[in-house]
Structures are given as C-alpha cells and as structure tokens.
Amino acid sequence: MNAAGGGSGSQAAGAAGGNSSLSHNALLATASGATTMPMAQLADGWLELESDPGLFTLLLKDFGCHDVQVEEVYDLQKPIESPYGFIFLFRWIEERRARRKIVETTAEIFVKDEEAISSIFFAQQVVPNSCATHALLSVLLNCNENNLQLGDTLSRLKVHTKGMSPENKGLAIGNTPELACAHNSHAMPQARRRLERTGAGVSSCRFTGEAFHFVSFVPINGQLFELDGLKPYPMNHGGWEDSEDWTDKFRRVMAERLGIATGEQDIRFNLMAVVPDRRIAITHKLKMLRTNQAIVSGTLQKLLKADEQGESGNGDSQRPDTPTTLLEPSAFTARDLQSLLKNLDTEIAINEQHLADENDRRHMFKVDASRRTHNYDKFICTFLSMLAHQGVLGELVSQHLLPSKKVSGQGAANRISKQSTTASAGGSTAGASAATPKTQQQQAAAAKNGKSPSKTPGRRRKGRNKCRKRK
C-alpha cells in the first residue's frame, strides 16, 4: 500500500521556535558542514512521502545509517528476525468514532514523568509533513548504539538533543538541513506542487479531515513504547513475559488496535519493520560456509592421500594429524566428507542467490526512486508540442476517440435490435396463446365423437370442396 504520509505539526515551526528557548544557531549546529538554508524553508518546506519500504531504506542511507533496511510486513504471525522497531501507517480521521476509542484507550498509558520522557528520544512533530522522518528517528535513536551504527548526522543529533523537551527535539529534527534535504529528495513532484498551492506552514493533513500518519513501536528498557509525534506524551504498553520476545507483545497490541480501528470496515493501514541489512547476515554466513568448505576440502584431500599411501605400502599408513582443522579425520570417512562437501556447495549456491536477490532489490529501489522523483511534465509538454507542430496531434486524438464512438453507436443499435426482436417474439407468443384454447376444444370434441383429432375441421372442408369440383 503506497499512501502518502504527511502528518501535521501541532503548530507552525516558526511560532514554536519563537516560544522555545532553543536558539536557531544551536539547531543548525547539528548539521555542521551543511549548506546554510533559510529557517522558514527548513521548517515549512517538508514534503509528503509515500509509504514504501524501498523509499525508507534509501532515506536511511541518506541519513548516514547504512546497515539498516525497511521491510513491509504482510503477516503479523510470521516471525521477523531481529527487528529494531516497527512503523505503523494508518488513516488519520480526527472525528472518526474508532479514532476516539483509540484515543481513550491510549490516554491511560501516557508516560507523563519528565525524567522518563527525557531518558528516551521522543519528539513532537511541530513541522508539517515530517512524520515519516520522525517515525524512522524514533526507532533508530532509541536503539542500542552497540547494535547499530547511526552515522555522523544522527549521532550528533542524538547527543545534541539529549535532555531536551519533546517540542525542542521536534524543532531540532525539522531544522536540520541534512535531514530536510534527504527527506525532500524522495518526494514526488506532485507533493511539491501541492505544497506550493496550499502555502508553506499550512498543514495539508490533520486539519483537512483525513490523512495518513506514521507512528513507531520500539522496545525500550524491557517495555514496549509507542511514539507518536502528534501525541503529547509517549505511550508505554508494558512489558512481556520472560519466555516471550518483544515482538509477541507487539503482535497483541496491534491485533487489539486493528480490531478497534476496523470496526467501521476501514482497513487502510500499512506496517513496516526496521531490520538489520539482510546482506550483512548473508555475507557473514557465506564467509563461514566458504571457510568450512575449505576445511572439509583440505581434510578430504589429506584423507584420500593417506589412503593411497596406505594401499601402496609407501610411507606411513596412519591418518594425518590436522590440528588446524575443525574436523577430526578419524571421525569421518571419505564418503562422509564428500557428502558434507556437497551440502556445503548447495548452501553456498543458495546464499549466493539470496545475496544477488538482495542486491537486485537495492538496485530496483534506486530505479523506482528515480521514476518516482523525476518530473515528467517538461517531457510530456514538449512531446505534445512537437506532435502539434507536425500536424499529427489532432489525427492521433481522433483515432483514439473514434473507436469509443463506434462502440457506443454499435451498442445503441444492438439495444434497438434486441428490443424489436423481443417485441416481435412477444406478439407471436400472444397470438399462439390466444389460439391455443380453441384448438384444444376442437380436439376434445373430435375425440368425443370417435374421430381422429389429427385433422382440423378446416382441412376437411377444403377436401369436400375439391370433391364437388371434380363431380
């Protein structure tokens, strides 16, 4: 599902910045080395993005986080390997009854303790259309740094915003040049035209009655948190059992949430998982398999060589000592090692194909991004102008319009013919039904007089007239 997720700020970024004690120079310092941009252009120039895992993966790379990817989740029950967090895209309708039920449910789990809020990265969305970046950062900046390499930009942002209020963290995100440029570089041209029509600083989502909004679900200190930039506080859904994974708790929360949200048959939502780059795990597994392949192959060669020497009687017939190998030669026969080597070759081929598939996916992400962000307006206008200049545009338009007219004319003729046929058939049927009772009475009278009912009285009269003429 590719829905544009815009989201709305709780207030204009400029107004929020005026009330904030955080200086604009400090905000721009989070992106050292970046080109200076007007503050209004940074805060009010964010564009809507589509909900696409390929787009989000490339956006993470542009942020400087290279070892992460985003995958779309189609089945909640299917296990997901080592997710950092989940991003939930849902249809936002302020006045919807199901929305009020969700608000009433989540209000009970708000975390209002300032110390607890400052210990996690929770940013309020004060900049319109930035909820996609907010959702990604809510996952990445709450992960353990030992498991994830954030890159220079996100690392500086995390350090700089430590201890800030959620509002100031939202301003820091909206006024970081690298984040704004990376975000807008993946927007469609229609989003830019829509922003120019509505005007900067005016939300195109929340206050128009309907939108699509992103929220994040991440595990923090043994608790499942829901981070929504349009909410005043983060939400704590509680912990999970010792025998469970945090994704089991997430599945239960999502099942309940979707059950409430789909009460009015509205199932427009999308779920994505932020996971480690699959290519890293595949590459590591390939390296291990190739190492084992070399060990098994070397051990097999030594074993075959020792057997040949034993059979010829030349040299020592004892098995070779291979302390550098992981396999003990005496525990395996040559046939066992050959079978093991064959299995390793198969596993290597399978993982090489998986790695090639992942690389092809990344290539297609870039191709789709080029198609998505390219502005085709100039090409289309130039192409149509050239056709008009050559005098063939009108002919092409007529050729494409005539078939539809012919089809509509044929359809009308078929309808008239069908109506005429139906009317004729109806008249014949009425006449036959009117004559049927008289014919039945004549046949009944003939049967009563002992005469054959096969001939009608009219035919007998004709026969008598012919006889009289002959006489």
Curated annotation (Swiss-Prot):
Its EC number is 3.4.19.12. Residues 412-471 are annotated as: Disordered. The gene is caly. It comes from Drosophila erecta (Fruit fly). The keyword Nucleotide-binding does not apply. Its main location: nucleus. GO terms for cellular component: chromatin; cytoplasm; PR-DUB complex. Residues 457-471 have a biased composition (Basic residues). This is Ubiquitin carboxyl-terminal hydrolase calypso. It catalyses: Thiol-dependent hydrolysis of ester, thioester, amide, peptide and isopeptide bonds formed by the C-terminal Gly of ubiquitin (a 76-residue protein attached to proteins as an intracellular targeting signal). Residues 405-471 are annotated as: Positively charged C-terminal tail required for binding nucleosomes. Residues 45-276 form the UCH catalytic domain. Keywords: Chromatin regulator, Hydrolase, Nucleus, Protease, Thiol protease, Ubl conjugation pathway. It is found in: Nucleus. CDD domains: Peptidase_C12_UCH37_BAP1. Coiled coil: none annotated. Residues 375-403 form the ULD domain. Belongs to the peptidase C12 family. BAP1 subfamily. Pfam families: Peptidase_C12, UCH_C. GO terms for molecular function: chromatin binding; cysteine-type deubiquitinase activity. Catalytic component of the polycomb repressive deubiquitinase (PR-DUB) complex, a complex that specifically mediates deubiquitination of histone H2A monoubiquitinated at 'Lys-119' (H2AK118ub1). Mediates bisymmetric organization of the PR-DUB complex and is involved in association with nucleosomes to mediate deubiquitination. Does not deubiquitinate monoubiquitinated histone H2B. Required to maintain the transcriptionally repressive state of homeotic genes throughout development. The PR-DUB complex has weak or no activity toward 'Lys-48'- and 'Lys-63'-linked polyubiquitin chains. The record marks 228 as: Important for enzyme activity.
